[in-house]
Each structure stands twice: as C-alpha cells, then as structure tokens.
Amino acid sequence: MFNTHPLSITNVAGLNDALGAPVINGTCTTCHDAPNVGNHSRPVPLDIGTSHAGSYESDAHVLAALGQLTVPDLPVYQVTCTGGPLAGTVRYTSDPGRALISGKCADLGRIKGPILRGLAARAPYFHNGAAATLTEVVEFYNQRFQMGLTNQEKADLVAFLKSL
C-alpha cells in the first residue's frame, strides 16, 4: 500500500504552492522515502494545516480534518500581513511556524515534519499535540489530502507506523 496506493494532491495551500506543483502525484514514499530516513521527511518547511484555528478556517478540507483535532488551551494568534502578495490578509494560527524566523506572512504555519522512526512512542502528535493517537493522525491526513483510504488501509497504515 505505501508504495502502491496512488495519491493526487491538489489545491492544498501550504503544500502545492510551497512546492510549486499544482498536482503532486505519487505514493506515500514520494515524500517519505529512503533518502529521508533519519532526517526530516521533507527539507522544505510546509504548512499542512495542523496549526490552523478551526473556528477561523475557510478551507473546507482543512476544517473537516481539523474537526477531530482540538487543543483549547493553545492561544490563537491573529496576524495581519503587511507586505507581499498577502498584504492586508488576516490569518489565524496556533503556531506561527517559520514566520517567526523569516518574518514572512507566507511562512505562517510552515514547519518541518519530524522523522517517522519511533513515532509510536512520541504521542501526542503534531506541533500542537492535537492528535492523541496514530489513528487520529492517519484520519487527519486522509481527510486533509483527500486520500480516500478504506478503513482497512487506515488500520494497515497505523500498524505500519507503529512498527517504525
């Protein structure tokens, strides 16, 4: 499944635009491949939506994926972009991410993904600790990236992640 289940990721803000690819076709190993074992999964910080504030989210796919992930104790930052193509845009996030370093509004929420090795021992998941289990992580990605995994494929993926 991990090398053969085809995925087409389109219109995912923070991913397709960050990589300059309107469509990303591949499999799980397109990003989580052997050269990246032991390192961050991708060398580029990406915004996959885990730090978005659900009550302010306008992207239906992010909102659906965030529905299960709530961390009420985290502050929500309101950021008004002052320069570049996002000037005047107001964004809400629980983790400013790379923007704290770069000062760029486009970097809000962008983070480097952690390595997958030893994942089962590192709960809770995501930078904000919003997912308590690997099942919640898999469900988030399945909804966020419209992967279309069956219940059996999700269970298989969780079992695989636990084995790393």
Predicted stretch roles:
Residues 121-122, 140-143, 163:
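Short, well-ordered loop/turn and helix-capping segments at boundaries between secondary-structure elements
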Residues 25-26, 153-156, 164:
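Loop/turn elements at helix/coil->beta-strand transitions in domains of secreted/extracellular proteins
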Residues 1-130, 136, 147:
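Short glycine/threonine-rich turn/loop motifs
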Residues 13, 133-136, 152, 156-159:
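Extracytoplasmic/secreted proteins, especially bacterial periplasmic and envelope-associated proteins
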Residues 144-151, 161:
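Long, low-charge, small-residue-enriched segments that form tightly packed helices used
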